[in-house]
Structures are given as C-alpha cells and as structure tokens.
Amino acid sequence: MILTGPEVAHSLELVEAQHLAQQVATFRSVTKRKDVCALNVCGGIAALTDSAFGRKLNHVTGLGMGAAVSHEAIARLEAEYGARGLDVEIDVCPHAVPSTLAVLSERGYVTNAFSNTYVRELADDDVEVSPPTGIEIVSGGSVSESTFVSHSVAAFEAQAKPRPRALLEALAVIAAARTDTTCFAATLDGHIAGTAGMSVMASPMGKIAHLHIASTHAAYRGRGIQFVLIRARLSAAREAGCTLASITARAQNVSARNTERAGFRLAYTKATLMKPLLKPTDAK
C-alpha cells in the first residue's frame, strides 16, 4: 500500500474530521450547551465550542477534500467564528482541491503553523506485543472515567507550555465519554505513569484507529511510557479489525519521535492557515 498517496490521505482526513465532529458532539452532550456545534463546510468540519479553548476545539479540518471551496462558504465561516470573537484557523491537507489555497489566499489567510499526519499499516503480529517487565497496560472498563481524567489533566498540566486547565479537563472528559474511544493507562510498579486514547472510525479503506490525548507524568518521562502506550493501542486496534492507525503531531516534538519509533510513516504535512479576527478598531 502506498501510504503517501491521495487515497490514504482522503481516508485520514475523513477520520480526522469525524474525530473533531465527535469531540464537539460529545462536549455538547456532556455540557448541554446549545451554542456548541460542528458545521459541515466544503468537505470538512468546523468546530465551534468555547472561545476559552482557543484553536484546539475551535478550528476547521478536512476543508477542500473532494469538495470545491467557495468565497461564499468561507465568508459564512468567518461570520460564525467572528460572532464568537475567534480567529479562523484552517488545517489544510496538501491533497485538498486547488481552489482551497486560491480562495484562502485571496481572502487574506496566512500560514502560521504546520502539523504532521502519520500513518501505519497494521498486521496480525501487532497483537502479539507485550509491555516490558514492570509496566502494565490497563484499558476500557479497567480505567474509570475519574482516573483517566485526573491523570490526563495532571500530566498535561506539567508540560512546559500547558493549555488551560478547563480545556485539558474537557478533552479528557470527551475522550472518556465517547463510545468510539478506548482509554488506556500505563502503570509502572503499580503507579499510573501515563494515559492515552484511541478512537476507531470507519473510512473507505476500512476501520482506522486514531491515536490521541497521550500524556506522561513528569516523574516517569524518558522511561518509554508513551512508546509502550502506542504499542498497546496498535495491538488493540488490530484486534478491533483496523487496517490503519493514524497520529497527528507537531514536527520535532516528543510525540513525533515516539510515533516514528513505533513504525509510523509521515503521510503528509498540513499547513494551518489563519485569518485574524477583524476588530472594530482595526477597521478604522
């Protein structure tokens, strides 16, 4: 299988769009907030949640994947984000239709970041991998929602540039509440060292496991915890009938290195195109 081709890219982008849509739907269900929504736009999904969450749960992905991008559609998008006081941030796949970059460029969008999408084929021998001595993996019903949420938030908060606690809590609660997602925890000598999630979604190429929300407590970093959690999720994905697994990560960070060590390949790099919110003072 050619992992860098358009067929794989379309499936990976579909899965990422589904993932974002499910995050939004779950957050809406948990909070009962009617202002939270996910909009279909030109083949992609636009997430609109709490403005305090920034771009993580307020951005667009999958735009232009098999669908033309129009000025009218983007203008409506800008109005939706502007009404909430948010910049518009759109993650654009290099396999998007040509009109995507043309329209965004004409509307004043600029690139402000990049992210890598990694993919890995799954094989039967992925199921046979066992964790190193001393490390135990627990998942599913063996990891309570409160345990997953508290440890996920604590580990992410200890990072050099932590996101707001409210966002970290929302992401963990969402992962624990989703019916398509399995939560994992790695214990070392009986203590939880790290946590992670895996969402299984359908695509034209079969079921794909999207690996996400992985974190390690500061005291256990550098001891291979995340690598073990990746391997455990690959095993579970294969058992669930998945043909591929995907991970998105910023280039040159620890997640990207662990991903490549686990046999993932870079499928493509996406650009984040952003248009700042036009404030009343800017228009004068």
Which sequence ranges carry the predicted segments?
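N-terminal charged segments
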Residues: 1-82, 97
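Short amphipathic alpha-helix that is part of the acyltransferase structural core
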Residues: 1-23, 61, 115, 124-172, ...
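A short helix-loop-beta-strand connector motif used in the catalytic cores of GNAT acetyltransferases and
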Residues: 30-37, 85-86, 112-114, 173-184, ...
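A conserved beta-turn-beta hairpin within the catalytic core of GNAT-like acetyltransferases
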Residues: 51-59, 112, 201-211, 221
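Acyl-donor-binding surface of acyltransferase catalytic domains
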Residues: 66-146, 255, 271-275
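Conserved acetyl-CoA-binding loop-helix of GNAT-fold acetyltransferases
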Residues: 70-79, 212, 216, 222-239, ...
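Conserved GNAT acetyl-CoA-binding A-motif
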Residues: 84-93, 237-250
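A conserved beta-strand-loop-helix scaffold within acyl/acetyltransferase catalytic domains
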Residues: 162-219
